[in-house]
């Protein structure tokens, strides 16, 4: 009996070896035919997300993770080869977005996302004030400005910094040539994220729109609000000749007018230190741990804290549902402002679904007014 079992085991092993040799041969042939722009479908055996190393063995929780609400995406071959691990392609079709007017007369929020090159994706939110002109200008021109800078500059933080400054300068020229004097007091926040090779995430921001990454179910803040409450920003405003005054709700404003210290536009406050130079953050994604990126405007941020945003999104089946859930939750919490969310799914989408949601009882129910 023992010898018979041993012979059966040996024969089984030989069959497995033959299968692996055949698979290796197929992989080698595919590798020779591969071009840098070629993306591999998950249905092909050479780079399945459930067989990342082509061994014929399914991935375990430790390798990548298998969960109920996962989004099956193709694998980006060149980055996967470069980094030595499977990098899922982020499909723009799966990006979720929603924008609600709230109790305002007009929705001054704008958002956008696009594939700029084979390697770089673009995501952005803009929250206008003093009319939608500045937000519209950014929405119309920022994408092209970034695209034009990419061939000349490899560092994405530098690309975004230059783009913000160029757009601000272009808007200034546009406003001064216009007969509409209201453009001189129109401004906008800007939070822009670039994703290169599905791994390198860079975020630039001015104002109080935010970006956060959900890693292992917890929020990782990628932006910091530019408000007069920040000591460094307040000192910078004073050094430039501006001042900070508080309104009846105890909210600080630059020159008694603007609730932020950095923005695109607001041309009448440039001499008082309101600048368009963004603060930037660079981070490397780990798709086994990172569920999504979410960009939000202050109609959400002043009502829903970062952990709540993570929890609400993690409860949803897909990013489109998640974006609507977050914006609608802000409305239910009593926000009066426009509310916009852009949700970008990553490799761990659905992995950290939590049956419990942590609520904050210290939320502010004051209007997030930009004007004193």
From Swiss-Prot:
Q: Where is this region: Critical for association with the BCKDH complex?
A: 46-61
Which CDD domains is this protein grouped with?
PP2Cc
Q: Which cofactor does it need?
A: Mn(2+)
Assigned keywords, A-Z: Hydrolase, Manganese, Metal-binding, Mitochondrion, Phosphoprotein, Protein phosphatase, Transit peptide
Q: How is the cofactor bound?
A: Binds 2 Mn(2+) ions per subunit.
> What's the chief localization of this chain?
mitochondrion
Q: Which SUPFAM superfamilies match?
A: PP2C-like
Q: What does this protein do?
A: Serine/threonine-protein phosphatase component of macronutrients metabolism. Together with BCKDK serves as a metabolic regulatory node that coordinates branched-chain amino acids (BCAAs) and protein synthesis with glucose and lipid metabolism via two distinct phosphoprotein targets: BCKDHA/E1a subunit of the branched-chain alpha-ketoacid dehydrogenase (BCKDH) complex and ACLY, a lipogenic enzyme of Krebs cycle.
Protein's recorded name = Protein phosphatase Mn(2+)-dependent 1K
Native organism: Rattus norvegicus
